[in-house]
Regions:
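Asp-based, Mg2+/Mn2+-dependent phosphohydrolase catalytic module
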Residues: 1-7, 104, 118, 122-222
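N-terminal helical cap/lid subdomain that shapes the substrate entry/recognition surface
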Residues: 2-98, 104-106, 119, 131
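Hydrophobic, well-ordered secondary-structure segments
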Residues: 13, 30, 77-88, 111, ...
Length: 222
């Protein structure tokens, strides 16, 4: 039986890789360097998801809102630290590699589309998933507005030769659900990520799954 979806585009952070601890460590290191308040790791679940610029904006004290010079300095410091430490605690969610291999064996084409800077996203995918599992990896670049705006998703689909009717976007946050819908795709939310089932359902997810096995069955039409 043919798979229900011929192409699947995955978010990265909170969907296939658990990057939260390293993102939080980089944010708190940057805050500590300035004598600013730091945050619990779990608080970063709601600071990530819209790219590094938004993440930095969210952990900077409110008194620096609108201070472009301080923002650029803080962003550079965060990027430098994260670039050196992005693999300290990061790893794939249990069952993810097996799920991806099952999908590929069934002929499903896989891609990654993330708001993480491309210079960080591409090496992480290479390290943890190799170069063969994903046909395309697209991180944040200046040429496109970030998710959930449609242009970057449409670009990925064009590169893949994907049909919207048989393409699924998979992620762990409201941003991801909107990313799929804004490009005319169905969106599946994964409850094991940073945000959880309630946010995904409120965002209008077409599907919400709790395990990698459940996601594979959905994609394969089982």
């Amino acid at each position: 039986m043919a798979a229900a979806f011929s192409h699947v585009i995955f978010d990265l952070d909170g969907t296939i890789l658990n990057t939260l601890e390293d993102l939080a460590a980089a944010g708190n290191h940057t805050c500590e360097a300035h004598g600013w308040p730091t945050f619990a790791v779990d608080e970063y679940r709601y600071k990530v998801g819209n790219g590094m610029l938004k993440l930095v904006e969210r952990f900077m004290p409110a008194e620096y809102a609108g201070d472009g010079r301080m923002f650029e300095q803080t962003l550079a410091e965060f990027r430098a630290y994260y670039g050196e430490h992005k693999e300290d605690h990061t790893g794939p969610y249990a069952g993810t590699i097996e799920m991806l291999d099952r999908l590929r064996a069934a002929g499903v084409q896989l891609a990654v589309l993330t708001n993480k800077d491309h210079v960080s996203a591409a090496p992480l995918i290479e390290k943890y998933f190799g170069s063969e599992r994903f046909a395309l990896v697209q991180g944040r670049v200046d040429a496109f507005p970030p998710k959930p705006e449609a242009p970057v998703t449409l670009h990925v689909m064009e590169e893949l030769g994907a049909d919207p009717a048989t393409t699924l976007y998979v992620g762990d946050s409201n941003v991801d659900i909107l990313t799929g819908h804004n490009a005319g795709l169905k969106s599946a939310g994964v409850s094991w990520g940073f945000r959880g089932r309630a946010e995904l359902e409120a965002a209008g997810a077409d599907y919400v799954v709790d395990t990698q096995e459940e996601l594979a069955a959905l994609i394969l039409g089982e």
